[in-house]
């Protein structure tokens, strides 16, 4: 989910007709016969603005795969910084969290509006600073299939292939590869890790780092219904309909006028507007569809949602090392679901370092507290340093100061809000064994 939920990326209306939107832009259309090309094949390219000083950016249209197995094409933006060596490549999955192609990262780069995203510039800059080249894919695909993890994972893996295939990027064919994503971006990264051994076994992947992971779409939908994050539920369901014909057909049968209008509206805007439009909405009621609170138990719905649950299939166990981080009191993405996926992978032989943030930073704060540590961990893997053997569960407190273990990154991210009274209150609750609320709940203390 887009953890900077107060940012609205709906820029199409502001830009007007001067720049074509992806649906009307010929650059996004693959050539005739593209279906026979191998996944990761590059069809066209164009330069764009990176929004970062000294960083060059080029967009490539490449072949990838839809959830139904058919061929499609999507766009990725390749970033090369002054420190990029050509020996390391990281796929960055931004938290798009929407079902509108104007919300895709490629459109932000093309229109020069990357500053409208709170994460795109800082995250990619941090990765570029390690000497890696970064590829930022529109992993949802041309149908904006938000929350359809398998399709997103294939889109990310094919972006790595495309970057390697694009010779002007200057990447070594033996470059060390990795991926990073948080929240909605962790759907794509987690599924890329799961599918890589079978879908893209030739890729030289050295590690994956992701956090705030919606490992179970069903539990995530249930968690945000009726809350200030309810917009994610509606856009997530709309994304399932965009990916699965069966889901769209079933919703057409059971939707009310209000439900159809909500899905239609979600398809015209980005995550910030979704959160505003659907504040406190509960899609699991008869206001939106005739099944009411039985919606997620409907066989057609269960089928597609189960297909998006990480860790259920032993054959999809990641083989490259993983760094997962999640806030114990994440108010958006259920902690237990992410932990369950990690445990399942570990039981099947994966190497996972699962970091639990117990300091009460919540969904947003955990990203700020541990994102830098995750990127540092990933850089160690790409640099050839092996992780500690096997799986480990690491606890973190002090508002994001991680406890150390062999093989962990040396960087320490310290996150705080500067008020000793707030810190003391959090420590008091923690010591008493009580839940520590997210930082936003303390807003009244500092306003």
Locate each region found by the language model:
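Catalytic-loop region of hydrolases
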Residues: 13-85, 447
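Short beta-strand element of the alpha/beta-hydrolase
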Residues: 78-80, 86-98, 102-110, 208
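Alpha/beta-hydrolase active-site loop
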Residues: 119-123, 146-169
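Primarily recognizes the serine-hydrolase "nucleophile elbow" in alpha/beta-hydrolase
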Residues: 161-232
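Accessory cap/linker subdomain of secreted extracellular hydrolases
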Residues: 211-315
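C-terminal catalytic histidine-bearing segment of alpha/beta-hydrolase fold enzymes
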Residues: 299, 303, 339-447
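Short beta-strand/loop motif that positions the catalytic acidic residue
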Residues: 318, 322-330
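Acidic catalytic loop of the alpha/beta-hydrolase fold
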Residues: 328-333, 364
């Amino acid at each position: 989910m887009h953890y900077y939920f107060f940012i609205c990326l709906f820029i199409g209306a502001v830009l007007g007709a001067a720049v074509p939107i992806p649906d009307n832009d010929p650059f996004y259309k693959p050539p005739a016969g593209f279906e026979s090309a191998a996944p990761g094949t590059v069809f066209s390219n164009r330069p764009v603005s990176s929004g970062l000083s000294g960083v060059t950016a080029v967009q490539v249209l490449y072949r990838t795969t839809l959830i139904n197995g058919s061929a499609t094409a999507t766009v990725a933006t390749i970033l090369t910084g002054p420190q990029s060596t050509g020996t390391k490549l990281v796929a960055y999955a931004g938290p798009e969290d929407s079902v509108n192609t104007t919300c895709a990262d490629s459109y932000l780069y093309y229109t020069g509006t990357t500053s409208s995203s709170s994460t795109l510039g800082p995250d990619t800059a941090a990765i570029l600073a390690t000497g890696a080249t970064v590829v930022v894919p529109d992993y949802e695909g041309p149908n904006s299939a938000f929350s359809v993890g398998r399709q997103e994972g294939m889109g990310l893996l094919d972006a790595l292939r495309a970057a390697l295939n694009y010779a002007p990027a200057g990447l070594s064919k033996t470059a060390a590869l990795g991926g990073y994503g948080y929240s909605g971006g962790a759907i794509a990264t987690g599924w890329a890790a799961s599918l890589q051994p079978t879908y893209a076994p030739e890729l030289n992947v050295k590690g994956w780092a992701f956090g705030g992971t919606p490992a179970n779409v069903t539990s995530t939908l249930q968690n945000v219904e009726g809350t200030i994050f309810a917009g994610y539920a509606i856009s997530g369901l709309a994304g399932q309909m965009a990916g699965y014909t069966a889901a769209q057909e079933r919703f057409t049968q059971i939707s009310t006028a209000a439900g159809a209008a909500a899905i239609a509206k979600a398809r015209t805007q980005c995550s910030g507007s979704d959160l505003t439009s659907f504040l406190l909405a509960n899609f699991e009621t008869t206001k939106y569809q005739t099944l009411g609170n039985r919606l997620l138990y409907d066989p057609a719905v269960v089928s597609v949602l189960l297909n998006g649950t990480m860790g259920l299939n032993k054959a999809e166990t990641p083989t490259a090392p993983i760094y997962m981080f999640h806030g114990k009191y994440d108010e958006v993405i259920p902690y237990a679901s992410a932990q369950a996926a990690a445990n399942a992978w570990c039981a099947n032989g994966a190497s996972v370092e699962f970091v639990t943030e117990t300091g009460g930073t919540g969904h947003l704060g955990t990203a700020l507290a541990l994102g830098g540590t995750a990127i540092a961990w990933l850089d160690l893997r790409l640099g050839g340093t092996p992780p500690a053997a096997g799986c480990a569960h690491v606890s973190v407190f002090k508002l994001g100061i991680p406890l150390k273990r062999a093989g962990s990154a040396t960087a320490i991210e310290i996150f705080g809000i500067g008020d000793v009274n707030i810190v003391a209150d959090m420590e008091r609750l923690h010591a008493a064994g009580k839940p520590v609320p997210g930082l936003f709940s303390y807003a009244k203390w500092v306003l």
